[in-house]
Amino acid sequence: MDLDMNGGNKRVFQRLGGGSNRPTTDSNQKVCFHWRAGRCNRYPCPYLHRELPGPGSGPVAASSNKRVADESGFAGPSHRRGPGFSGTANNWGRFGGNRTVTKTEKLCKFWVDGNCPYGDKCRYLHCWSKGDSFSLLTQLDGHQKVVTGIALPSGSDKLYTASKDETVRIWDCASGQCTGVLNLGGEVGCIISEGPWLLVGMPNLVKAWNIQNNADLSLNGPVGQVYSLVVGTDLLFAGTQDGSILVWRYNSTTSCFDPAASLLGHTLAVVSLYVGANRLYSGAMDNSIKVWSLDNLQCIQTLTEHTSVVMSLICWDQFLLSCSLDNTVKIWAATEGGNLEVTYTHKEEYGVLALCGVHDAEAKPVLLCSCNDNSLHLYDLPSFTERGKILAKQEIRSIQIGPGGIFFTGDGSGQVKVWKWSTESTPILS
């Protein structure tokens, strides 16, 4: 995996895999009535086994790549901000994205196990993805339980993956081989990187490793599992099982993390954190989102529109995006008074586990949206037009972006997959 932006060397992670075939035209074709009812047994069937595209959806305006704010972590500008787009609140879902997305294609469970007797005649999918604008490069096997985090430190030639199997695995970016396994003696709830620091959330503590000088620190204080970590300016935030958010301030003189505060307000575990626009956003199992000022660490607003666990949060241009097990992705925008309110709700058929904002090969903004039916959808923004999806053995819990059009997914079976945007990407309708 030579993660060189120029793509000079064709290494493991930059080797383009076999992409899906481009879809045929839908002109003069009809959707199979029996397929819609879930009982078509014809192969080949002369009719379409997918819905016809709706009204034409033009391309999203080229991304401005603006951040919500130019805040920097203690190691410099963060690389985890979502891309922006030139849009306003009324652009969301303009091309029919407000309808509930219904899954119409299923992964063949026998193919996954390597023993499908039907071969090419099988009615179910024998591939890990649908869409011709990205492709699978390679698969990293080794974890025995759900992958809870993926980190690619800036400037490093190593990829780090964490799991509930109590390990962090280290992968060589050039060969794709596992070069080391850290046995931590406890389930890993999350992992992030910031500059030279690798930060790992565990039961009752946060581990901090400096991969440049091998410094090894244990940050005590959390009660229960640490589910989420994020860095804002010189502060490290940890979302914990007891509903509190612990804060440490990085001391550049001593290269240590000094306890700074404990943010109270959530009544159940804090499972998602994000920093943007001089704010900390926290999502919890109590179904709420809290907005905290980074100036004084006070809660300035509580958002209660979700009806189940708030699983993931990202900032995109001037908007906050949140997802929940209530099957929705909500888009929040600030009112004239400064408070956030829902400006658009995108509905899924299943609970939504994780969000990640990326740019495709043409610099268009795309939302990666993982659901608990073992799928990940790719949506153009702000229209929410679907352009492809990724399928997995189990739920995709972790998504991480790398340079050069690379992105990673980790699922409940322990598999980590490496994907890459195609040089020429063409949106499709599934």
From Swiss-Prot:
It comes from the Eukaryota. WD repeats lie at residues 142-183, 221-258, 265-304, 306-342, 345-389, 391-429. Keywords: DNA-binding, Metal-binding, Repeat, WD repeat, Zinc, Zinc-finger. The keyword Zinc applies. InterPro entries: G-protein_beta_WD-40_rep (IPR020472), WD40/YVTN_repeat-like_dom_sf (IPR015943), WD40_repeat_dom_sf (IPR036322), WD40_rpt (IPR001680), WDR86-like (IPR044715), Znf_CCCH (IPR000571), Znf_CCCH_sf (IPR036855). SUPFAM superfamilies: CCCH zinc finger (SSF90229), WD40 repeat-like (SSF50978). Pfam families: WD40, zf_CCCH_4. A zinc finger (C3H1-type) spans 26-52, 102-129. Gene3D superfamilies: YVTN repeat-like/Quinoprotein amine dehydrogenase (2.130.10.10), Zinc finger, CCCH-type (4.10.1000.10). One of its GO terms (molecular function) is DNA binding. The keyword Methyltransferase does not apply. Residues 1-27, 56-90 are annotated as: Disordered. This is Zinc finger CCCH domain-containing protein 48. It comes from Arabidopsis thaliana. The gene is ZFWD1.
